[in-house]
Amino acid sequence: MNIAPQFPTPEVTTGTLPASAKVHIAGEIHPQIRVPMRQITLHPTSGEPPVNVYDSSGPYTDPNATIAIDAGLPRIRAEWVVARGDVEPYAGRHVKPEDNGFASGEKLTPEFPVRNAPLRAKPGQAVTQLAYARAGIVTPEMEFIAIRENIGRKAAKDALIRDGESFGASIPDYVTPEFVRQEVAMGRAIIPANINHPEAEPMIIGRNFLVKINANIGNSAVTSSMAEEVEKMVWAIRWGADTVMDLSTGRNIHNIRDWIIRNSPVPIGTVPLYQALEKVHGIAENLTWDVFRDTLIEQAEQGVDYFTIHAGVRLSYIHLTVNRVTGIVSRGGSIMAKWCLHHHKESFLYEHFDEICDICRAYDVSFSLGDGLRPGSIADANDAAQFAELETLGELTKIAWAKDCQVMIEGPGHVPMHKIKENMDKQLKTCGEAPFYTLGPLTTDIAPGYDHITSGIGAAMIGWYGTAMLCYVTPKEHLGLPDRNDVKTGVITYKIAAHAADLAKGHPAAQVRDDALSRARFEFRWEDQFNLSLDPDTARSFHDETLPKEAHKVAHFCSMCGPKFCSMRISHDIRAEAQKEGLEAMAAKYRDGGDLYMPVSDEEKPSVGE
């Protein structure tokens, strides 16, 4: 391990969320693992136990953790990886000027201070979670995931309500490590976990598990810095992002990515083609297999957990996009289409896919097979180009599986609501039930500035139908690079979509948090309502805009109805009177015409301006 010279360290957001604590559960098969979750404490008057929720925020919300961005996070998986005996350290490649877009001097982002020798598979070995699963091995990663996915299930076992529609998914009442192994072995789930990203807490992406969300970050040629991108990553996972994609397209790509990975407790994905293009000065026609191969190894050594590879864009499909309203909207897809047309030959990604698999299996980099021909408008949804590419992605999935590589499939895009289910059904059939990972989809094209909403609608639907991971869309989609606030809005929007899908699919214990918040709402436990919400800060601030005093936090009304017309307060009164007089007497009273509003006392009247 080498340590580079010191320099100013970027600052990131830390600290617990309101009324929350970080708790850890130990493994049974692998006692050394400690699975984090967030425990939300309720008000003593509730008489209810704390509510545990899935937590992807890493040590940044742990008050007992020491955060040192220039040192990176604890390498929790390092011993697990080495103990398997199938990896070897080596010197790795040297960083070249083109890795950082030829940035130099003051424009060059400093290297990450700590450098560990990269690992790779020993000759003839596959070090993927898929290879282990097929061999019948339950890895520590698999047990870690089982504990994570079971949050709330054991406590709620007797009261589990399974009234959802899962559209053929096989969601168990209780997730065992063996179930995780089976799903991975069958290719229906992936565990993105590069052996060179030991800081990552294991998670799973699959139709029979909780729906996950991804947040995109990354610099561009005109804006953002390393410090901003590291903070965006930390900020995104604070609010619930399960993975993060670094889509940087400007200078300093290598060094920025190193800072992100070393400080990320969630899997990091990339589109290697973007960096490869920077290495040839942005000229797509000058891309070569050698440049791309070198970029794959560079990123695999750093610890990238999944690659988006646009190998499904074939020369013969490009003409199918000519009459589209919006043509080819995928950056990677358009780059490869331009390359294919210029050279009039098949993409080097398609031609060298076997070799790409060999690289991925040596580091356990999962495939995210890119949808380079996805529709960029609802007018182009479900067209011949989109589904031709999907057929090729199905073929590539089989090739990758044959080499023990983990695979998920990327999906659209822009799709109106009535065409969404066809996408899910075709993907399951064509790609052998490999996990589906979709961008939205956006259900209408008329709302720039609000595309987190247009896409959130489609995301909830396709998540219900079976998509395993949803890629967030921010309000800045189609308009500009998202900032910190946009990242939060996108993450919260997609947490709503993913959770709504979990509820609709009938995931056990998915409703525990909803019911706890509903009881708090009915009992006017305002602090519990805020703390149980996905965004406690916003919920509290909206309430306090009109009722700011501490006394209002225990009031039995809000500013929507006021004390006189509060429906829940009226319901409390009806319930109390019903218990007192009996249901039959109450029914007779209200048939005769009784008052259905509460009298308000002078003490409860809000003063002017409150």
UniProtKB/Swiss-Prot annotation:
Its EC number is 4.1.99.17. It holds the Pfam family ThiC-associated. Substrate binds at N216, M245, Y274, H310, S330, R331, G332, D371, G372, L373, R374, E410, Y437. Pathway: Cofactor biosynthesis; thiamine diphosphate biosynthesis. The keyword Metal-binding applies. It is an enzyme of class 4 (lyase). Zn(2+) binds at H414, H478. GO terms for biological process: thiamine biosynthetic process; thiamine diphosphate biosynthetic process. Keywords: 4Fe-4S, Iron, Iron-sulfur, Lyase, Metal-binding, S-adenosyl-L-methionine, Thiamine biosynthesis, Zinc. Binds 1 [4Fe-4S] cluster per subunit. The cluster is coordinated with 3 cysteines and an exchangeable S-adenosyl-L-methionine. Its cofactor is [4Fe-4S] cluster. It catalyses: 5-amino-1-(5-phospho-beta-D-ribosyl)imidazole + S-adenosyl-L-methionine = 4-amino-2-methyl-5-(phosphooxymethyl)pyrimidine + CO + 5'-deoxyadenosine + formate + L-methionine + 3 H(+). The keyword Glycosyltransferase does not apply. GO terms for molecular function: 4 iron, 4 sulfur cluster binding; carbon-carbon lyase activity; zinc ion binding. One of its GO terms (cellular component) is cytosol. [4Fe-4S] cluster binds at C558, C561, C566. It comes from the Bacteria. Catalyzes the synthesis of the hydroxymethylpyrimidine phosphate (HMP-P) moiety of thiamine from aminoimidazole ribotide (AIR) in a radical S-adenosyl-L-methionine (SAM)-dependent reaction. Belongs to the ThiC family. Homodimer. This is Phosphomethylpyrimidine synthase. It comes from Allorhizobium ampelinum (strain ATCC BAA-846 / DSM 112012 / S4). The gene is thiC.
